[in-house]
């Protein structure tokens, strides 16, 4: 007869009808009983030929691709002028007095952040924008390109101008001022940032001030001439609108106007008269930010031509005959002035050598499940988390549930602050730019790459004979619709661009570490500035707590002004006032303890409704199920041990079959959730100890002992002794000398025993007592006549490394008082 759910609960001692604990509980450690129960519940699944289930409700395998939904009406969010003050340490010290060593160390990490991977993998520009929406390729391209443009305008991205120069918008930092272009600034400026040069400045004078200089260019030219085939061109990059830098490129480029037969003559002309006043032909290359200067003798036929040769793919349609009713020339001829092919930033700096490549692709998704009107940029820098380019990210403290409850479970009134674009507050050093590159290859190459019928190949790109290969009804209709949204920016966005991050991106493992250090140090400063307030943060979630609503509002105003003075942007529309029950990190935290938020409880109920029985479920789907159930496991009777069969199947990468009894057991567990309470300090007067053959207790001055029917592993015996101590004394603070029992997870014990012990020892705190000082050591060895001196160890609840509470150093007396009315507390409130 299969084991029913009521019988199984009775076996686990979860009902009132259980017999004496000293007799019943050791049976649960028996290996044979655990094996028989597992077989009866079908928990040890042999290899079966039944097809696996790969989808349970909304849960799919971790590695299965869900179909993303594109919204053509996505709104690109606007970013404020985010500029975190560089002297943030001085500003904090003016506000609160001397900072602690830890606070200074954390703040120095982020001004400016460094990121130096070993060997990044560079990808072609074609992979800059991921084709996540095959039905909306062009629309997604322009929306993503517009998002990148907004980030660049907001000072969050650098724009690669040349191999060794970049431009950006916004306020410069001091380390950017030191990286000015060349030894001497082009214009006299105190900041040393290269401004836009005056119109009409000759190319010669600009080249003299180039960091490479004339001689180095000639040396490079002479060296590169040896062993190279094809033409060598003097390429002058536009670092500002009128200032140039000379570099050389070999024959591998795709835009070689000079024919092979004239390459020798062209090389000698460049070499002999590289910087003399010759007629030049300016031509924008496909990268959209380079100008190629071809030196041509004045008497040549080419110099007699009228006007420059148009290389802009977009503008070439103006001079071509329409190929059909859907030819792009109809669109291009709508405007006379399509604007520049490229834009330049307000400031220009030198950067390490940066290729015209990307290190990660980008695409757009909904901002969050509750906001589908706005888009969010997803950056895929996963190469830094896997393979040969993997980077070991620094670890940081994540608050566990008990520490969080100990710290925040109180009768305070709460509100939470929303930091606008929190990651984009933290600046990156320009030396990290070559490793964090995003961009696009331009519309023509992007469409050509995705079109299976396109005849465009690299060396033909942009020439007149294949110009109309792009023309199609779908492209024409898409561009006409986008023209209403972006106007003449369609031309700008159709050009290639390479961008590097100036602020930390979300797709790199270094970013959450830096953000956690930043917000935790800021909250530490706020806590010391306002002793009657509790400020706490995890990543970009900041919460403030105070005794009364009036006090909280006053502190909120002062803290907001302080954060704004540091350059931290808050979104006042998203400030939430929670009353006395704080919603934080998926929990509801009040004076009674912590519970999961309601939306998580609803997800669990939906999961059990759709959970199939007697059908093998893919272990990757089981990972998703365990992720949800594991979040709420501390609030159930049996906790994590109840999920151990699922953990075992995931570890073995085998399918798992839910038996009706096991599913009913889990469902009963999650129907009633018990709050995790705040631990209270107290005196430990109950001690437990065990040997493989017996157990002993010391309850005050009373001593007890007992023996096991058969020898048990020492950890199992120690756990049984702790359960007996809790059952006999009712004490919620127990002393033990076993480190495994001190752990709140009982997943390493026999399955049935772990489930029962989790319920018996719920809300029990443990104090470590060395064996030599443990009063229960003698009874466990059968010596009741010997009495050791009774210890009085004090239990102090831990808040882990997450509270980061620092006692305030002496504050200068001239600082004004922070709270100008009678404080609601007689003494400064401190975390427990």
UniProtKB/Swiss-Prot annotation:
Swiss-Prot/TrEMBL GO biological process terms: DNA replication; symbiont-mediated suppression of host innate immune response
Biased composition (Low complexity): 208-224
Region (Disordered): 208-241
Sequence similarity: Belongs to the hepadnaviridae P protein family.
HAMAP family reported for this sequence: HBV_DPOL
Note: Hepadnaviral virions contain probably just one P protein molecule per particle.
Protein name: Protein P
Organism the protein comes from: Gibbon hepatitis B virus subtype ayw3q (isolate Hope)
Gene of this entry: P
């Amino acid at each position: 007869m299969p084991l029913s759910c009521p019988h199984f609960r009775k076996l686990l001692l979860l009902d009132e009808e259980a017999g004496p604990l000293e007799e019943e509980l050791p049976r649960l450690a028996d290996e044979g009983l655990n094996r028989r129960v597992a077989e009866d519940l079908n928990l040890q699944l042999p290899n079966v030929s039944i097809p696996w289930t790969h989808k349970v409700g909304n849960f799919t395998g971790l590695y299965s691709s869900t179909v993303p939904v594109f919204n053509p009406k996505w709104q690109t969010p606007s970013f404020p002028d985010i500029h975190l003050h560089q002297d943030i340490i001085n500003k904090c010290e003016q506000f609160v007095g001397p900072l602690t060593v830890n606070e200074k160390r954390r703040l120095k990490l982020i001004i400016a952040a460094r990121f130096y991977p070993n060997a990044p993998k560079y990808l072609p520009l074609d992979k800059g924008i991921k084709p996540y929406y095959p039905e909306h390729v062009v629309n997604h391209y322009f929306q993503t390109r517009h998002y990148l443009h907004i980030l660049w305008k907001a000072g969050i991205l650098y724009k690669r101008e040349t191999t060794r120069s970049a431009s950006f918008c916004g306020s410069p930092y001091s380390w950017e001022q030191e990286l000015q272009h060349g030894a001497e600034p082009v214009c006299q400026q105190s900041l040393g940032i290269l401004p836009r040069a005056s119109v009409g400045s000759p190319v010669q004078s600009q080249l003299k001030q180039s960091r490479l200089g004339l001689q180095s260019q000639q040396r490079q030219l002479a060296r590169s001439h040896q062993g190279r085939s094809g033409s060598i061109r003097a390429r002058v990059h536009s670092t500002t609108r009128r200032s140039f830098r000379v570099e050389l490129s070999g024959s591998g480029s795709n835009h070689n106007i000079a024919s092979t037969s004239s390459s020798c003559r062209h090389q000698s002309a460049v070499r002999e008269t590289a910087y003399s006043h010759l007629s030049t032909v300016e031509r924008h290359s496909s990268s959209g930010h380079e100008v190629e200067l071809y030196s041509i003798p004045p008497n040549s036929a080419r110099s007699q031509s009228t006007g420059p040769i148009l290389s802009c793919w977009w503008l070439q349609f103006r001079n071509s005959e329409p190929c059909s009713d859907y030819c792009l020339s109809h669109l291009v001829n709508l405007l006379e002035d399509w604007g520049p092919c490229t834009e330049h930033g307000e400031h220009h700096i030198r950067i390490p050598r940066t290729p015209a490549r990307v290190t990660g692709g980008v695409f757009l998704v909904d901002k969050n499940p509750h906001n589908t009107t706005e888009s969010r940029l997803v950056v895929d820098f996963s190469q830094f988390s896997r393979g040969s380019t993997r980077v070991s990210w620094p670890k940081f403290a994540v608050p566990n549930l008990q520490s969080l409850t100990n710290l925040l479970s109180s009768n305070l009134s709460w509100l939470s602050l929303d930091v606008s674009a929190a990651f984009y507050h933290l600046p990156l050093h320009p030396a990290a730019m070559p490793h964090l590159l995003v961009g696009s290859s331009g519309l023509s190459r992007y469409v050509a790459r995705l079109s299976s019928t396109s005849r465009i190949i690299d060396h033909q790109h942009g020439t007149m004979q294949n110009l109309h290969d792009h023309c199609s009804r779908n492209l024409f209709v898409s561009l006409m619709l986008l023209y209403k949204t972006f106007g003449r920016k369609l031309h700008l966005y159709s050009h290639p661009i390479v961008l590097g991050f100036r602020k930390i991106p979300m797709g790199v493992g270094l970013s959450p570490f830096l953000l956690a250090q930043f917000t935790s140090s800021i909250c530490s400063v706020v806590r010391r500035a306002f002793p009657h307030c509790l400020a706490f943060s995890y990543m970009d979630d900041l919460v403030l707590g105070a005794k009364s609503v009036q006090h909280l509002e006053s502190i909120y105003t002062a803290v907001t002004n302080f954060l704004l003075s540091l350059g931290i942007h808050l979104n006042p529309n998203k400030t939430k006032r929670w009353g006395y029950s704080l919603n934080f990190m998926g929990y509801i935290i009040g004076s009674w303890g912590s519970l999961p938020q309601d939306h998580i409880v609803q997800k669990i109920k939906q999961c059990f409704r759709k959970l199939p029985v007697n059908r093998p479920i893919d272990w990757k789907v089981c990972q998703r199920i365990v992720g949800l159930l594991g979040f709420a496991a501390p609030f159930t009777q049996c906790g994590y041990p109840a999920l151990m069969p699922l953990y075992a199947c995931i570890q073995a990468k085998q399918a798992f079959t839910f038996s009706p009894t096991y599913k009913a057991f889990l469902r009963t567990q999650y129907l009633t959730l018990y709050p995790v309470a705040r631990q209270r300090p107290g005196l430990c007067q109950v001690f437990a100890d065990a040997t493989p053959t017996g157990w002993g207790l010391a309850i005050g001055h009373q001593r007890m002992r007992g023996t096991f029917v058969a020898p048990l592993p020492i950890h199992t015996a120690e756990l049984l002794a702790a359960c007996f101590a809790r059952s006999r004394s009712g004490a919620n603070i127990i002393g033990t000398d076993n480190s495994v029992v001190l752990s709140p997870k009982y997943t390493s014990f026999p399955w049935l025993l772990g489930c029962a012990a989790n319920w018996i020892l719920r809300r029990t705190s443990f104090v470590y007592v060395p064996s030599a000082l443990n009063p229960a050591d003698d009874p466990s060895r059968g010596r009741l006549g010997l009495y050791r001196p009774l210890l009085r160890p004090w239990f102090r609840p831990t808040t882990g490394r997450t509270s980061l509470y620092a006692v305030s150093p002496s504050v200068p007396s001239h600082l004004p008082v922070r709270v100008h009315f009678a404080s609601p507390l007689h003494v400064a409130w401190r975390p427990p």
